[in-house]
Swiss-Prot record:
Family, similarity comment: Belongs to the transferase hexapeptide repeat family. LpxA subfamily.
UniProt KW keywords: Acyltransferase, Cytoplasm, Lipid A biosynthesis, Lipid biosynthesis, Lipid metabolism, Repeat, Transferase
Catalytic function, reaction form: a (3R)-hydroxyacyl-[ACP] + UDP-N-acetyl-alpha-D-glucosamine = a UDP-3-O-[(3R)-3-hydroxyacyl]-N-acetyl-alpha-D-glucosamine + holo-[ACP]
Keyword Acyltransferase: yes
Lineage per the UniProt record: Bacteria, Pseudomonadati, Pseudomonadota, Alphaproteobacteria, Rickettsiales
Pfam families assigned: Acetyltransf_11, Hexapep
Location in or out of the cell: Cytoplasm
UniProt subunit comment: Homotrimer.
Primary location group: cytoplasm
Membrane-crossing residue ranges in chain numbering: none
Protein name as annotated: Acyl-[acyl-carrier-protein]--UDP-N-acetylglucosamine O-acyltransferase
PROSITE patterns: HEXAPEP_TRANSFERASES
């Protein structure tokens, strides 16, 4: 543990193995069977327990929890482990849990992965290299994720599923089956169903104007002609309706995204 930098408030159990130039920030708790390889950095308030190994140059941010027992009723304190490779970035509130007897006794993470805030990696998962997990992705147990996969925020993957190499899963997707390599998976996107009439009424908007604006957006999103022409026609037709004018102004602004699809 030569050249290691350990904050005075960190709790390092006897038996912990530290490589060179390891940095352990305030209030971290490290168990006795943990191995931290060279240049690992724990920012602060990181908890690492169990039989756990963290590869070199991995950086772990506050309130992450690594190597805790699996969340299964059958767990019987077996000596399972958590192995994390090199050059990983593990952001705030990430949880990576140890393996179990029913899954090879090991949860394994490869190299060069990015785990954004709140990601959960369940017991016995096998994660490849160069994978991106966006915020609050949740993997159940026994899941395999191939190299270079990208999983969008708030997506959840069912136990035993396989996520193929170079695949992409869109945000908010419930994944209950295998995803082929190079596959693109997405759940149904949010649609525009109308106007927030109840909220508008509560804020004092004129009811007649609100209902008229609802008719206007129906004409914009589902009328005849191209979209730009419909916007122009509606702007002329409802030029005395301040709500419609505000919507038209928004539609005419530059944007890098499309508008939510209208479904009445």
């Amino acid at each position: 543990m030569s050249n290691s930098n350990i904050h005075t408030t960190a709790v390092i159990a006897e038996g912990t193995k530290l490589g060179n130039n390891v940095k352990i920030g305030p209030y971290c708790i490290i168990g006795p069977k943990v191995v931290l390889h060279d240049n690992v950095e724990l920012k602060s308030h990181v908890v690492i327990e169990g039989i756990t190994e963290i590869g070199e140059n991995t950086v772990i941010y506050p309130f992450a929890s690594i190597g805790q027992p699996p969340q299964i009723l059958k767990y019987a304190n077996e000596r399972s482990s958590t192995i994390i490779g090199s050059n990983n970035t593990i952001r705030e509130y990430v949880t990576v849990q140890a393996g179990s007897q029913g899954g090879g006794m090991m949860t394994r993470v490869g190299n060069n992965n990015l785990f954004m805030v709140g990601v959960h990696i369940g017991h016995d998962c096998k994660i490849g290299n160069n994978v991106v997990f966006a915020n609050y992705v949740s993997l159940a147990g026994h899941i395999g994720v191939g190299d270079y996969a990208i999983i969008g925020g708030l997506s959840a993957v069912h136990q035993y599923a396989r996520i193929g190499e170079y695949s992409m899963i869109g945000g908010l997707s419930p994944v209950g089956a295998d995803v082929i390599p190079f596959g693109l998976v997405s759940s149904k996107r949010a649609v525009l169903e109308g106007l927030n009439l109840i909220g508008m009424n509560r804020k004092g908007f004129d009811k007649v104007k609100s209902l008229s604006a609802l008719k206007a957006i129906e004409e914009i999103f589902s009328g005849e002609g191209n979209f730009a022409e419909r916007i122009k026609q509606v702007a002329e037709k409802y030029n005395n309706n301040s709500i419609v004018i505000q919507i038209i102004d928004f539609l005419n602004q530059d944007s890098s995204r499309a508008f939510c699809r209208f479904e009445k």
